[in-house]
Amino acid sequence: MKKFNRQEIEKKVNDVLVDKLGIGYSDVKPDAQLEQDLGADSLDAVDILMELEKEFYITIQDDDIYSMTSCKVSDVYDLVERLQK
């Protein structure tokens, strides 16, 4: 299984966010909050996490799902990086 570097993680996460939230790449900044800045709700968060699991071959725990809407984009990068180890 391929391990993705940070740059690849950021690009793939950004692609998923743009696709699932219908936003532009210019909206996706590391310090943007998923709910407050990007308009993600809890259903969006589940959809995003399911896609990330497929893209990165990882399993995301329920605890991470519950905190997803209040986290920043950079937190999502960190989560993926941590879970693929």
Question: Locations of the language-model features?
Answer:
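Phosphopantetheine-dependent thiolation modules in NRPS/PKS and related acyl-activating systems
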Residues: 2-40, 49-50, 54-85
